[in-house]
Amino acid sequence: MKIWTSEHVFDHPWEMVTTAAMQKYPNPMNPSVVGVDVLDRHVDPSGKLHSHRLLSTEWGLPSIVKSLIGAARTKTYVQEHSVVDPVKKTMELKSTNISFTNMVSVDERLTYKPHPQDPEKTVLTQEAIITVKGVSLSSYLEGLMASTISSNANKGREAMEWVIHKLNAEIEDLAASARGSIRTPMAAAAALVEK
């Protein structure tokens, strides 16, 4: 078993970061995620948003893994459960693979919280527990997978920034459109008054 952990601070408020987290896929930084299906989403009586999603991924595999499973690329599935608490301003996301569970399990947990000293920033804490089963090189493979998870975490943070930029652009477009739709009738009214 190999445990990997990481912490990252986003220079964006919690509301923006959690919105981006729910819209992270697909993105150009991690093209291996080829699909996201929402299986269930509901708000509980205390106001927490619960989501259960299925992520479809397609990976090119290292040569040692190819020889073990007999495939060069494989589609895998990950189940993801998240809980967003808007009162406490926390988002916890847990994911686990549901493909190849007889060979490997990857259990990941991400937590998003406002930065304790700066509410305009958000702290992301990540943890992954990797277990390779029934292979003599399991510790080597677990280390290799931890390295891949670390690399993908960096891509994930880049993807979050990409989504946040996209969301900010959409907000600005909506604001500009709203300003324009207000100005047009006002300009027409002013023209009528001048006549």
UniProtKB/Swiss-Prot annotation:
Alphabetically ordered keywords of this record: Phosphoprotein
Domain PRELI/MSF1: start-end pairs: 1-172
Keyword Iron-sulfur: no
Residues found modified as Phosphoserine: S46, S51
Short name of one Pfam family: PRELI
Family indicated by similarity: Belongs to the slowmo family.
Listed name of the protein: PRELI domain containing protein 3B
Organism: Cricetulus griseus (Chinese hamster)
Organism placement in taxonomy: Eukaryota, Metazoa, Chordata, Craniata, Vertebrata
Gene encoding the protein: PRELID3B
